[in-house]
Regions:
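Fe(II)/2-oxoglutarate oxygenase catalytic core
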Residues: 2-524
């Protein structure tokens, strides 16, 4: 309600009267190339045949997907300067979630400022008609336009703009002199045979009074790279022309992550690695009580100090092979090849997969991650659809290192886990995506960070939990050395890691900042 109220107040009666009397404001003229019939015909043919075309201030390029660049889009420099002034006087709202961080104005559909109104009329009037002729489709009169400000560390990560009704995306830049070193480029991605983004194929540096547009399609993956300039504002008008959506292929489904049962290791491994405090039965009971109240807990100084230091140092060894995890519309970070791990790192990995550790987690959380964990009434209700005649003794077989699925494709009775060793540095992130929501399960997340003693919250790299289809964060886990985070999530709770921004690697830092973590997920 606050944003609507602000918009109403900015259009108060006295101000409206003043604007209505502004008939002297010049009518906006578009780039000459757009007005030429010959150019329109040539662009239409080039777009249809997916070939390159250029004339004057207009260029059509079809790699990695069709996009058009029109420089000096609005013909009057004075008009553009006044448009910029009006836009900067608007009320802006901070927008931040897994995908983006920037400031956005209220909807400009009904704004009365003369230069904003004239630009809107030109875009969704004459230019919409021109664009419809070029594409050979009838674009709807729907007005969909807003203003965005990107400043230092603001970003819009890889996505394809897919939303019912969006046919063509456009951006009109109103920026000061801009270089690629300032960041904020519009990056266009190539795609693989599964219509998934691969890598940046082309970067468009913003420039004053330049319009960029592209058709929203299954391959129109793009991003606004992080703004690196600390004193420039990337101001733009952006929106969509609506029309019949292009046909989309079935969504690609990533292969399911392999889940493994525990490794047969006894409690000796716990005494070797873990702070004795957490092996005390009475303290485990306290932890379980707290965990059952909040479904999350952070256990500080979890590993023995000497073990933690040993693993921290080993994770920096150059022998470890780090593999980039993608695709960029879902994630971007590095994961270690298990075969390349130093001995102590591999031993820590085995600790987290050991039978003894599964039992310890059961004691911490009350979850059935080991057959010795006592059942309770709530858990019995969860399993009331189990095969008739099943007895508690059969679950003892779950201590075996091999999981066997029940007949009829039922979930394996053996608790399982999956995990990886990750490295986080400038540009790393994970995103929420539809497939993750569709495949969500009840699960226990474990995060054990290393090398983040001087990590600051403003750097990013935080693990955020949100309810499905909601932006509000339910829980945030901050990277903290040797602090074991445990979070139990249901099928409606999703997680992402916030983009690690430029502040993490500024030149005033003594070293390029990065941190590591063991990330495991356990299933009952």
């Amino acid at each position: 309600m606050s944003s609507k109220r602000a918009q109403d107040e900015s259009g108060a009666t006295g101000r409206k009267k003043k604007k209505r009397s502004s008939s002297s404001v010049e009518a906006v003229e578009l780039c000459g190339a757009v007005e030429e019939e010959e150019v329109k015909t040539a662009v239409k043919e080039a777009w249809s045949s997916r070939t390159h075309y250029s004339k004057g201030d207009l260029e059509l390029d079809c790699s990695p997907f069709p996009h058009c660049i029109i420089k000096n889009f609005l013909s009057s420099q004075t008009f553009v300067e006044n448009l910029q002034r009006e836009l900067l006087e608007l009320n802006f709202n901070e927008k931040s979630n897994d995908l983006y961080k920037f400031k956005q104005s209220d909807d400009l559909k009904k704004r009365k400022e003369p230069h904003i109104a004239a630009t809107r009329a030109a875009l969704f009037g004459r230019f919409r008609s021109w664009l419809g002729d070029v594409l050979g489709v009838e674009l709807e009169p729907t007005v969909d336009i807003s203003c965005a400000k990107y400043e230092y560390t603001d970003v819009l990560l890889c996505h394809d703009d897919e939303l019912e009704g969006r046919r063509v995306a456009f951006i009109l830049y109103l920026v000061p002199p801009w270089q690629s070193s300032d960041g904020g480029s519009l990056d266009l991605y190539s795609t693989d045979g599964n219509f998934q983004p691969e890598s940046i194929a082309k970067s468009l540096v913003p420039s004053w009074n330049t319009l960029v547009l592209f058709e929203v399609s299954p391959v129109s993956f793009h991003q606004v790279s992080e703004v690196l300039s600390q004193d420039k504002c990337r101001l733009s008008l952006s929106g969509w022309f609506h029309g019949p959506s292009l046909e989309r292929p079935p969504r690609f489904k990533e292969p399911s992550i392999l889940k493994h049962p525990h490794l047969p290791r006894d409690e000796t491994v716990l005494f070797e690695w873990i702070n004795p405090l957490y092996l005390d039965i009475s303290y485990q009971e306290q932890i379980q009580t707290e965990f059952e109240d909040s479904s999350e807990i952070q256990l500080k100084d979890f590993l023995k100090e000497e073990k933690f230091r040993e693993v921290s140092e080993a994770l920096r060894q150059t022998r470890i092979q780090w593999m980039k995890r993608g695709p960029p519309n879902k994630r971007c970070y590095e994961s270690a090849s298990l075969d390349s791990l130093p001995e102590c790192v591999s031993a820590c990995w085995e600790l987290l997969r050991s039978e003894a550790f599964f039992l310890l987690l059961s004691n911490f959380t009350g979850l059935h991650l080991h057959f010795l964990c006592p059942a309770d009434e709530e858990d019995e209700e969860k399993e009331d659809d189990a095969e008739e005649g099943e007895v508690a003794g059969t679950s003892a077989e779950s201590s075996s290192s091999t999981a066997a699925a029940d007949d009829g494709g039922r979930k394996p009775s053996t608790p399982v886990c999956c995990g990886e060793v990750r490295r986080w540095s400038h540009g790393s992130y994970t995103l929420l995506h539809d497939a993750e929501a569709a495949q969500a399960e009840y699960a226990l997340d474990l995060i054990l960070p290393f090398g983040c003693a001087d990590w600051q919250t403003e750097f990013g790299g935080l693990t955020c939990y949100v309810a499905n289809e909601e932006d509000e964060e339910l829980l945030t886990v901050y990277p903290e050395d040797n602090s074991l985070a445990l979070v139990y999530r249901d099928k409606e709770t999703l997680k992402f890691v916030k983009h690690v921004n430029h502040k993490s690697s500024r030149v005033d830092s003594s070293t390029c900042r990065e941190f590591y973590d063991f990330s495991f997920v356990y299933y009952e």
